[in-house]
């Protein structure tokens, strides 16, 4: 029977569909273990300003402080000329990932401007995050990511790329 018939005889409330739509919201995910995120973020207009010892030191310093400031543990990272890749995991009292990323970009931007006399926008607003699923491992993703400088023709082997490292171990 059409919905109009049920509505006309009072079996279905006319606002039923709207009420259901308002109640059917996406539920928050519940994790047994805290997930590991793979993050990629790019410089504004993809300017190649990151691959230097000075910038690498600033980024690594701020990643080291992320645990105390924001409750995020940073694992391995690769700094490319115009983007960075890193892995991270939240602690129990961590700030939201978007809040952490916004703050990290602000802190690194301020330090790059102050310490390196850089003017202009450092980062794009957005970032890419991917939760590592059970079918993919941290080490497999890391092996792929650390080959980026090789694929970009910057070095012959991944071990030659000097702007990579690990802040804390995320291995389970």
Model regions and ranges:
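Short catalytic/metal-binding and nucleic-acid-binding patches
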Residues: 1-172
């Amino acid at each position: 029977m059409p919905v109009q018939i049920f509505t006309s005889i009072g079996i279905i409330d006319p606002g039923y569909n709207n009420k259901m739509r308002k109640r059917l919201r996406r539920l928050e995910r519940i994790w047994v273990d805290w997930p590991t995120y793979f993050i990629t973020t790019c410089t504004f207009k993809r300017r190649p300003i990151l691959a230097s010892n000075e910038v690498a030191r600033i980024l690594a310093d701020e990643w080291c402080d992320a645990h105390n400031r924001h409750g995020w543990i940073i694992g391995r990272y690769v700094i490319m000329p115009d983007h960075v890749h890193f892995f991270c995991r939240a602690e129990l009292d961590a700030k939201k990932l978007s809040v952490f990323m916004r703050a990290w970009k602000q802190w690194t931007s301020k330090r790059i401007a102050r310490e390196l006399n850089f003017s202009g926008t450092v980062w794009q607003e957005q970032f890419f995050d991917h939760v590592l699923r059970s079918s993919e491992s941290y080490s497999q993703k890391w092996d792929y990511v650390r080959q980026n400088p090789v694929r970009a023709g910057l070095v012959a082997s991944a071990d030659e790329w000097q702007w990579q490292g690990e802040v804390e171990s995320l291995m389970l």
